[in-house]
């Protein structure tokens, strides 16, 4: 075999994290300090690929029965690569990965790729390889609404008016560590509207913030010290992503979300190439929440795809 394939173990965390940090398509979500916060929920089956003793790539993954899944605790996944990746070797890697998986009792693969906005240089060798080697087919496509800052679209009138309302009402925006206060707003909204809870508990998001204080950031909008809205952003090398956003009834009325987005998109992170509002699927289906997409498009966002592929072994 060309590649030595090694299953990740905790003693390799330093090597894993160092590769992620210098990769061309990795983000802090692939850092083991992030991935392992919910290690009890998944049977981790992440893999490391060595070429002549040098680490060539990483695959964040978990096992579910006879299926290898790009790690289901992460928004996106796929092969993490560096600048030395070549198309021919990546085709070989996936051919040998399939052999390895068959030997270890797998029959199916579910593969999430890293969306192109997170690529620091061209990084779609994996997509070419799975089409050539694995007979991969598209299993699911979600829509993420994104602003490309170099070609930013002016906010729609409805959003500009909401921003003006917030300014006239005297709302103040601040970078905050009051995750507890915002989680109360978020929990109440999700419970009332969807009968659900945030993916992260308060304790988990506070833990992750302490581990990644510059990558996980909370902004709140207040009036007289009362939190009317908040947005948690995930900050990677070139993408700022709205991971959570929520407002109280009064906050919605006064445009509290809009004034926070103005601060984040047009001021604090304006120099970042992309701002991503997150995906808008309805309960993990192929349907989109049209009203939510409409709101995001009002800020000048437009669609990119978050894809999952599958193949049989």
Task: Give the residues covered by each predicted segment.
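A structural micro-motif
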Residues: 3, 107, 171, 272-273
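A conserved beta-strand-loop-helix scaffold within acyl/acetyltransferase catalytic domains
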Residues: 3-52, 56-67, 115-251
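Short, high-confidence coil segments that cap the C-terminus of an alpha-helix
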Residues: 42-44, 103-106, 216, 270-272
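Aromatic (often tryptophan-rich) hydrophobic motifs at membrane interfaces
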Residues: 50, 58-61, 80, 86-98, ...
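Short, flexible, mixed-charge acidic loops at enzyme active sites
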Residues: 67-72, 292
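A gly/proline- and charged-residue-enriched helix-loop-helix capping module
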Residues: 72-120
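Short, solvent-exposed loop/turn segments at the edges of secondary structure
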Residues: 72-76, 140, 304
